[in-house]
Every structure is written in C-alpha cells, then in structure tokens.
Amino acid sequence: MSTAKLVKSAPSALLYTRNDLDDSVKTSTIALLNQLVVDFIDLSLITKQAHWNMRGANFIAVHEMLDGFRTSIIDHQDTIAERVVQIGGVALGTVQIVGKQTSLKSYPTNIHSVQDHLKALAERYAIVANNVRKAIGKTEDEASADILTAASRDLDQFLWFIESNIE
C-alpha cells in the first residue's frame, strides 16, 4: 500500500487540451482574444448597419466595399474565436456579451449620408485596428499573434479605404 498522499489541485477554468502553452499564457491570451471577438462582432454589425442605411454620392461603391469588409471581419472573428477554443477557452460571442463588453461606442442610427457613415465607421475601425495591434504586443502566444497580425493588415487597409472616401 502506498503512503503517498493525494494532492488535489485547484480546478482549472481552462478546458482540457494537449496544447502545451503555459496555463497563464492561455488564460491571458483567451482574455485578449475574447475581447477582440466581441469587438469584431460589433464591428461586423456596425458595418452592416451602415451598408443598409447610407444614401448619397458614391453609394454603390461604398455599399459594395462594406460588404467585402464585413465578410473579411467575420472570417477573422471566426479564426480568433476558434483560437480561443484551441487553447482551452470558451469563445464568448453572444449578443448580451457583445452589448456589455464592446470597446466601441454605440453606432448612430439617425445618420444617412454616405459621408456621415464613413466618418462614424472610420472612428470605430480605428479603435478595433489599434486594439488588435496592442493585443499583438501583449500576447505571449506566437500563433495568436500571427492570427492577429493578419487581421491587423486587413483592418489597416479597410481603415485606409474608408478614410480615402471621406471628403
């Protein structure tokens, strides 16, 4: 009979995975990534809000441009959320969570001109693009940093396109 004592470890908030990242790296990375999941969901919805409701000069060009942006944002959002799960987290993307945790201020629903929408979008795209860049510098997980670098490149390009259309 063994005299070894059983040592109970504290329960982990992480889901089991064979991924060997340190638990503290996983935990901090999950928090960073989940905030970005929230921001990307909000940005995708804001983009569609503008897409539906703008009127005026260059409507069709901007309308179609925003559709492409939204598709890419959703693709990045999915990749980021899946990375959360890959490293033992739970991706948080419900409407309730997005409403409580978004970094973006509420999008105005009383604007209609293409220019007003572009200005409102530029402000919000800049916030998300800057938050992604900050997260790249904070994460100690190279795979997550790589995912965020790809998203950062696209967001910077989208912001440039939006700003280039502002008169």
Swiss-Prot record:
What main location does UniProt list? cytoplasm
What's its catalytic activity?
A: 2 Fe(2+) + H2O2 + 2 H(+) = 2 Fe(3+) + 2 H2O
> What PROSITE patterns does this protein map onto?
DPS_1 (PS00818)
State the GO CC annotations.
cytoplasm
Which InterPro entries does the UniProt entry name for this protein?
A: DPS_DNA-bd, DPS_DNA-bd_CS, Dps_gammaproteobac, Ferritin-like, Ferritin-like_SF, Ferritin_DPS_dom
Q: Name one GO molecular function term.
A: DNA binding
- Amino acids binding Fe cation: H51, D78, E82
GO terms of biological process kind: chromosome condensation; intracellular iron ion homeostasis
Q: Which UniProt keywords apply?
A: Cytoplasm, DNA condensation, DNA-binding, Iron, Iron storage, Metal-binding, Oxidoreductase
Pfam families cross-referenced by the UniProt entry: Ferritin
What Enzyme Commission number(s) appear in the record? 1.16.-.-
Instruction: Name where it's found.
Output: Cytoplasm
Q: Which family does it belong to?
A: Belongs to the Dps family.
**What NCBIfam families does the entry give?**
PRK09448.1
> Subunit arrangement?
Homododecamer. The 12 subunits form a hollow sphere into which the mineral iron core of up to 500 Fe(3+) can be deposited.
User: What function does this protein fulfil?
Assistant: During stationary phase, binds the chromosome non-specifically, forming a highly ordered and stable dps-DNA co-crystal within which chromosomal DNA is condensed and protected from diverse damages. It protects DNA from oxidative damage by sequestering intracellular Fe(2+) ion and storing it in the form of Fe(3+) oxyhydroxide mineral, which can be released after reduction. One hydrogen peroxide oxidizes two Fe(2+) ions, which prevents hydroxyl radical production by the Fenton reaction.
Q: What PANTHER family does the record tag this protein with?
A: DNA PROTECTION DURING STARVATION PROTEIN (PTHR42932:SF3), GENERAL STRESS PROTEIN 20U (PTHR42932)
Which protein, by its recorded name, is this?
A: DNA protection during starvation protein
Which organism is this protein's natural source? Pectobacterium carotovorum subsp. carotovorum (strain PC1)
Q: Lineage from the top down?
A: Bacteria, Pseudomonadati, Pseudomonadota, Gammaproteobacteria, Enterobacterales
